[in-house]
Structure formats: structure tokens, C-alpha cells
Amino acid sequence: MSKPIVAVVGRPNVGKSTLFNSLCGQQISIVKDTPGVTRDRIYAEVSWLNHNFTLIDTGGIEPDTGDIILSQMREQAEIAIETADVIIFMTDVKQGLVDSDSKVADMLRRSHKPVILVVNKVDSFEKMMPDVYEFYNLGIGEPFPISAVNKLGFGEVLDEVVSHFPEGSDTDKEDDRPKVAIIGKPNVGKSSIINKLVGKNRVIVSDIAGTTRDAIDTAIKYNGKEYVFIDTAGLRRKSKIKEDLERFSIIRTVAAVERADIAILVIDATEGVTEQDAKIAGIAHERGKGIIIAVNKWDDIEKNDKTIYEFTNKIKDTLAFMSYAEIIFVSAKTGQRLNKIYELVDHIVDAQTMRIPTGVLNEILTEAVAMKQPPSDKGKRLKIYYMTQVSVKPPTFVMFVNDVALTHFSYTRYIENRIRESFGFRGTSIRFINRERKEKE
């Protein structure tokens, strides 16, 4: 089951970013071996009482005029309603209850999503509670007083948040259909690809409402097998502000990727691969999803015998951190190569669920270490005692070593490459965990 998504909504300057940063602490993982991926602090992974969830800060630009503020808050609320399992609605006790709070509260109430009302900047719970009680007038339940700066009141808020997380159901576990998120920048043809896949195959297509979110999934049957496609295209209300569009695009991507097994990153062939493509790709890569890069609008490109080769190299340079990704050149307009997507999805699902026997794995490890010695530091060399696979989706391996401090991502990448040479794992990331073990054990 995917991790729940918690979105933070509120007026400018009520302390959303302070709350976000305080809850995340040092848990935002910077992937050091991921060049080209700039990590926005729009989303982060948070853990509370054995509950893991993705926290999203919906706030983007903070304009000055009241009308624009209300308009932007509505967009924040809309994206939260659309993508989140639980919404934290943040207000400011010092500014008091204002009209835009009431209007956004009305939107949130109609969404039927769990809304946690948080009143920030309560520096003294004893003295300021009468001011906090004013927020009962919003009609969305009990206001929780906090001080984001002083980290007061977080426990009660987080307890309330996790109490609303959906329970895993039997149907979740039994649904073994591949779930494929179509991700990418706005206007690269994501919806067009799904529409063409639906139209081409002339089969019964059901729109399945997400169990906890408003996203619509499309189930398509091809060669007797069902696939679920998750579309991240377009907000219901289009923002006119470029930075908001980009932020909302990322939030929608996080929400879709959390629920998917495989992500198809759609790139516009006429624009080439961009930094924004790399940023979006990084979301799927960090979450260990299978990845297909679909270069759309290929029919609009003037080609010679080197065009595919040159474009592929450009993708591999810009997205070097996910060299394992499958690449396909397609046209949503003509349907060119779209049916090959199913073949790639099946292939990646097999790779994601592949298990390597420990004995075979350690033969590969022994050969790799013999060919290239592990790194050393201050006269002490890294020793890798053995390796075992502990999980799938993505394939995850534990390496038992003498000193975790001696491990280096470049040597781990070398081991990964040896494993890929032996077993493939095309289209899926591989994860490694280093564990220390004393030599006598």
C-alpha cells in the first residue's frame, strides 16, 4: 500500500514553512549520487509512531494583495483536496480569524477529506487559549494550538493526523495489476498517450475512483491482461503563475508516483530533455519505482540515421542517475510504438520482483571484489563479508561490512553494475543497505 499524503494549506506568513521544516527535521534525504536533480523542499518523508507519510507544502508564491492571496489559497486547497489523504489547515492566532480562512474552510469542509485545524504562534497555551477557541467558528472541528518555532503541540497534531490514515484492505493486497503513473511536465502529452492507448485497444475501460483521493485511474486490458494507468495531467483550475504550475505539477507527481509500481516519464521531443524533466524523474527514482522514458511527439522531429542515438545519449547524460531506465520513442498523435509500453511494463515488473539466491549473489560479489579492491581510509580497508537480497519492488540488497564509514557510493555503484551485468534489472532501480558486522560474528 502506498504511503499516505498529508498536505499543509494556509495563508502566507502563518508559518507553513516553519512547520514543514520542523516536522521534516533532518529526514529530507539528499541523494548525493543524483546529479541534475535539484531537491525542492516541497515534499519530504516523515515518520511518526511507526507511521510513514509524505508531507507536502502546498504554498508557493506569497503575493501581496488580498484578492490574489485568496485566489492562491483556493488553488492550494484544490491541490490538497485532489492529492492528499489528510489536510493540515494552518492559521495564525496573532492575526486572528480572517475572511479568507473562512472561505477556504468552506472548500475543505465540502471535500469530505479529514482536515486538521492548526492554530500557530501560540507561544503560551495557558494565556492564549481563548484566542484559539475563536477558530471553532470555522466549523471544521477542534483547533489544535501549536508553536512551530518552539516546536510545541506537534505530538497532538501528529497523533490526530495518523489517526485518519486509511487502513490497508484485502483488496489492496489482492490487486496485482501493474499500476503505471504517467508523469512529466505540463503539455508534453500525458493525457494524449492514455487516450490513444484506450482508443487503440477498443476494450472495456473502467474509470476507477481512487480509494482515498480524487484522482481517476484508467484500467486498460491488453492481450488479456489489465493495466492501471494513473494520469497526473492538468489541474481543474489552471494557475496563471508559472512557479505555481511547476509546484502543483510536482505535488501531483508525488501523489501519483506513491501509488504506482512504474512511472512513465513523458518528454517532449521538440523541447529535448530539461532540468525540470530531471527533477520529475528524481521523484520516481528516489521512491524506487520502475521507470520508462517515453519521448513523445517523435513524429514532429526531422530524423536521420543518428537521431535516436544522439537523443538517447542526451537523455543518458541529463538523467545519468537513472541509467537503468528503459527509453522508447513514441507519438501519441499517430500511436507509433505505444503498444510497446505494455511489453516494457511486463518486463519491468519481472525485474522488480526478481529474487537472486544468496549463494549466486555472493559468487558475483567475490568476483567483483577480486577485480576491484574496496576503498580504504587511513590504512583501514573496507571488507564486504557477504550480501543477501531482502526485498523486491525495488530489489533491495544488504551488504554486511566491517565498517559502514568506509563504504562509498562509487563502490556501491560498481557492485550494482556487476549485478546488473549478470541479472539485468532493466527499468528498475536497485537499493543497497550497508550493515556493520564484527569479524568474529
Curated annotation (Swiss-Prot):
InterPro entries linked to this entry: AAA+_ATPase (IPR003593), G_ENGA (IPR031166), GTP-bd (IPR006073), GTPase_Der (IPR016484), KH_dom-like (IPR032859), KH_dom-like_a/b (IPR015946), P-loop_NTPase (IPR027417), Small_GTP-bd (IPR005225)
Subunit structure: Associates with the 50S ribosomal subunit.
Gene name per UniProt: der
Residues bound to GTP 1: 10-17, 57-61, 120-123
Top-level taxon of origin: Bacteria
Record-given protein name: GTPase Der
Record-stated family: Belongs to the TRAFAC class TrmE-Era-EngA-EngB-Septin-like GTPase superfamily. EngA (Der) GTPase family.
GO BP, sorted A to Z: ribosome biogenesis
UniProt keywords, alphabetically: GTP-binding, Nucleotide-binding, Repeat, Ribosome biogenesis
Binding site for GTP 2: 184-191, 231-235, 296-299
Lineage of the organism: Bacteria, Bacillati, Bacillota, Clostridia, Lachnospirales
Domain EngA-type G, first and last residues per copy: 4-169, 178-353
